[in-house]
């Protein structure tokens, strides 16, 4: 009896144990990452030929304690390598694990190689050569703490390489994991199986091979036992012949069918090639088709199983499309696949909840470094009385109501950018802004008392409902997360896409960037204030402080300002402002752009202006500013400097976003100024629900 070890992906050990026992293995013992078992020579070859789950089958040769590199060398050399392979064979060493002595796996592999070579040369035998790419023998050494385990890898290449996949193609899951996923679906061979996002077809091919009794090792050309001295070619040929006979019989007797589709024509072509090479091409129909086009291939029965490994995203900007995809799949399953089973394997359990289906079973597994889950569902048959479930129904109804109200109003006003929803319902705590045919959903960060998983699921529901109600393509929705009322944070960079969208606001054309920054380049709540500045600016010298992207300057310029001066500390935003001015034909010496700390510039400037717009941050302690700034504490010092720049008869429009801001009217009077609050006049319909979003004042000489 041979003592053997079969390695596998984390989470599949029990499944592998059952498989090995069915092959005839005895004394199976599950450990993390694999199964120890025993079997005769025939079982060695059967496990290599028939295991769909094992990553490798290894023959343990011994263990040694490693307190120094010499210990490793001597421990390896103690094995009788001349009984393992012949001098003319090539070999390679795979070394994994480190300890205080062996701190580099390449160094460990070198010491093992030296020990093996010396074992031959000391017997005056020719030294075996190393071949890292295609060796006859693979030696596996795993170092854990002070113990090195040495084994012969009888697989050669990993057993996931069945011999049918184009090696140039990238597979999101290995074939061994794909086989496990198929086994866990509850799918019964002989019933239909469909994968609507099949990629290169791995899941369907593994299922078809399982259903037709085709051994996973049947198409492999190389094995790790080819140079093994104890290899029994006769028994191997018997095992191989039996596998070929069973495969022919299984294919001839199988009558059901498999269906695969994907939106990418290139991967579908690869899937067809892979299926043909696997010997089951005639059983699978592959189509180029998007999930939105998915239909039941057997509407009159029999019932089958839908199985897939749908895409998932690690970046926030990919989530809206994925949420829409999962939500759509859930609706299609309910509408067209009643009575079928559904099994999805994913690294994002939150996305699976977008299906709006209740899972009957779930399994955990590792896909490389990723923690994944497989969930199985049974789709109930629809009845004449059943109505499709609405996702976030209260939110969807409110958004639909707001859309009807604001869409017509915005068209009449001549604006393309407006707020559709602003946390109208406390449990749906987001803002939804429209920018032409794009939509930005901003999630206000939930309180720490709210369960993070529930908050994320609520957000996914919001996105699915938003896409559905507004009828937009998922790639036209941008998702952001922000803290409520923590200042504008306008300088926070989120991305590097550099994609700008031209929008209109009354008679102005402006550039917005929906993806690269927390804000988009256009504060929608100041829309009416900008229009007022345009109406007030004819023939006047206009100053815009803390200008951001200069949208207020554009309105002033279009309103007929004699000159405009735009000041901001950020070069990025000044360049953006320049683009906005140029877009509206506002160029030349009359339109100055100044990069400076606005407070310092204000203290030193000695020019005069008829109209000044200033929208300072609530609080700032930027390293590039000389002093920390607090708008409540420091607004009088600001007014003192502004008065010095204000021409007789001039006006200051002063705005800020501090909730509960109190204007120091007595302080203004001492400066010879008076203030008229115009906050309510500057709130348009889409911001009427949030009366504290900003404060706005007109300040003139008393």
Curated annotation (Swiss-Prot):
Organism superkingdom: Bacteria
InterPro entries from the UniProt entry: 23SrRNA_methyltr_KL, DNA_methylase_N6_adenine_CS, RlmKL-like_Mtase, RlmKL-like_Mtase_CS, RlmL_1st, SAM-dep_methyl-trfase, SAM-dependent_MTases_sf, THUMP_dom
Localization in the cell: Cytoplasm
SUPFAM superfamilies the record matches: S-adenosyl-L-methionine-dependent methyltransferases
GO CC aspect terms: cytoplasm
Keywords per UniProt: Cytoplasm, Methyltransferase, RNA-binding, rRNA processing, S-adenosyl-L-methionine, Transferase
Pfam families for this protein: Methyltrans_SAM, RlmL_1st, THUMP, UPF0020
Molecular-function GO terms, alphabetical: 23S rRNA (guanine(2445)-N(2))-methyltransferase activity; RNA binding; rRNA (guanine-N7-)-methyltransferase activity
Broad class of enzyme this protein falls into: transferase
Chief location category: cytoplasm
Annotated catalysed reactions: guanosine(2445) in 23S rRNA + S-adenosyl-L-methionine = N(2)-methylguanosine(2445) in 23S rRNA + S-adenosyl-L-homocysteine + H(+); guanosine(2069) in 23S rRNA + S-adenosyl-L-methionine = N(2)-methylguanosine(2069) in 23S rRNA + S-adenosyl-L-homocysteine + H(+)
EC numbers, comma separated: 2.1.1.173, 2.1.1.264
Residues in THUMP domain copies: 43-154
PROSITE patterns referenced in this protein's UniProt entry, alphabetically: THUMP (PS51165), UPF0020 (PS01261)
NCBIfam families linked: PRK11783.1 (NF008748)
Family (UniProt): Belongs to the methyltransferase superfamily. RlmKL family.
Function: Specifically methylates the guanine in position 2445 (m2G2445) and the guanine in position 2069 (m7G2069) of 23S rRNA.
Record-given protein name: Ribosomal RNA large subunit methyltransferase K/L
